[in-house]
């Protein structure tokens, strides 16, 4: 194998696939990154057997070939190089990769590429290599920037507790004209739905995707060409899902990335049953102001289980003008009281929330104003952007019960 590429492009590709490298594994090859030079592209690949990522970058290939090298060493070395051309050559007999960039030279011991697990691909139509597995299934196209926003607004609500694997996933439902995502950790629920430009499925398809997989996809999409859709493939057995993303032109960019993920084999809870059907108090407040007030309150709430009391009250005479007051108390640090003007309909109410949960959802709302709907201090509250219906974006958060 003899191949050349730009340092910026290789660094970008390694940063993308590197997050899929197995942190701890009994298989040494899973701690490596695969480099495969072919068709004037350099494919980088990594997997932990749950998530697999392929990334293709532009390259000049003189001799085709492949090798796997330690991920951490390769990434740190490439990031230390100047932004110039990198020449790589493989000594097949010793499985050693020689790298040269400007006046920097290195030799890295690797493992045979044939030992590396095969990562499924969406395919380009000309695959003849027996080492390539083209994933078959239902193909769906999604608008790139809209998909990233959906992921950001939902995946944070998933659980990180591996003892509850079902809640570590995001339920993704493909309908003929609609895409819906939902995630919950048992204390909060985030549901986001969007219209599809054209139907890709005749019957609904619902799968449970690990939140970590969607999080990685969101990071990849941040550098993607938003003019091209993300292609999604769901296998007929509903055990794998693949996302294909196209990159931008220029230095420090990739040609395309494919993320393949195992699906969670479990039934997601019926979250619709916990969504409040009515409310007694409706509060409309400036999103940025509320987010800032919660962050200030959290400074005092950190020593008290992050509890922030939220009191809403309508204006004099029952008019819509009113206020929202946030209170946080620490036995050792003191207390904080923050007041904001708000449009309040209904009765006075005080309810306590986890400040972190409020910050998480408010940070993902772009709209200028947000709606908080509540019934009583012991019942869940709902948060959504003003102007978006409950069938578009809805966040439900359970109240806390601070000691009196």
Feature map (PLM): residue ranges:
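Structural preference for solvent-exposed beta-strand-turn elements
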Residues: 1-404
């Amino acid at each position: 194998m003899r191949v050349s590429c730009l340092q910026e492009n290789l660094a970008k590709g390694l940063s993308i696939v590197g997050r899929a490298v197995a942190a701890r594994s009994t298989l040494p090859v899973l701690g490596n990154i695969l480099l495969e030079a072919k068709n004037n592209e350099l494919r980088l690949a990594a997997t932990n057997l749950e998530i697999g990522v392929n990334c293709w970058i532009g390259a000049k290939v003189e001799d085709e070939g492949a090798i796997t090298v330690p991920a951490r060493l390769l990434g740190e070395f490439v990031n230390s190089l100047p932004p110039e051309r990198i020449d790589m050559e493989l000594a097949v007999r010793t499985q050693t990769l020689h790298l040269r960039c400007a006046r920097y030279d290195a030799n890295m011991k690797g493992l045979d590429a044939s030992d590396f697990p095969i990562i499924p691909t969406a395919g380009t139509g000309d695959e003849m290599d027996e080492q390539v597995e083209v994933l078959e299934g239902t193909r769906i196209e999604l608008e790139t920037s809209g998909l990233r926003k959906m992921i950001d607004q939902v995946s944070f609500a998933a659980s990180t507790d591996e003892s509850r694997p079902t809640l570590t996933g995001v339920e993704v439902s493909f309908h003929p004209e609609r895409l819906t995502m939902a995630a919950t950790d048992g204390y909060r629920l985030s549901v986001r739905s969007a219209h599809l430009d054209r139907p890709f499925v005749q019957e609904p398809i619902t799968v449970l995707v690990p939140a970590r997989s969607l999080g990685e996809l969101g990071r990849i999409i941040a550098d993607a060409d938003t003019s091209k859709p993300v292609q999604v493939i769901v296998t007929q057995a509903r055990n794998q899902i693949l996302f294909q993303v196209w990159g931008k032109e220029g230095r420090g960019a990739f040609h395309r990335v494919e993320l393949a993920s195992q699906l969670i084999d479990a039934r997601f809870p019926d979250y619709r049953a916990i969504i409040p059907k009515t409310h007694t108090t409706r509060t409309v407040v400036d999103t940025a102001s509320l987010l800032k007030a919660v962050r200030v309150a959290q400074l005092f709430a950190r020593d008290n289980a992050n509890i922030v009391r939220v009191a809403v009250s309508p204006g004099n005479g029952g008019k819509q003008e009113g206020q929202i007051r946030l209170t946080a108390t620490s036995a050792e640090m003191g207390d904080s009281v923050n007041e904001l003007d708000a449009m309040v309909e209904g009765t006075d109410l005080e309810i306590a929330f986890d400040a972190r949960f409020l910050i998480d959802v408010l940070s993902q709302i772009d709209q200028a104003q947000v709606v908080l709907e509540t019934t009583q201090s012991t019942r869940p509250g709902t948060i959504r952007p003003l102007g978006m219906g409950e069938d578009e974006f809805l966040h439900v958060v359970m109240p806390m019960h601070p000691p009196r």
